[in-house]
């Protein structure tokens, strides 16, 4: 899966759950800029952060 595909899925989850980038960043103890970079395909979350994202949204890692 490409960076853009992962970013699109992250953004889709966030919007589907009616959460802003700021809210997600606060819940994950990260910056809003990090969330933005993921969603635009400029970077991807590390493995531990991806686990936190999955727990936050209650999705399986296979979603990505």
Regions from the language model: what does each represent?
Residues 2-3, 18, 38-42:
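Canonical J-domain
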Residues 23, 34, 44, 60-63:
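Residues in the helix-turn-helix
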Residues 48-63:
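DNA major-groove recognition helix of helix-turn-helix/homeodomain DNA-binding modules
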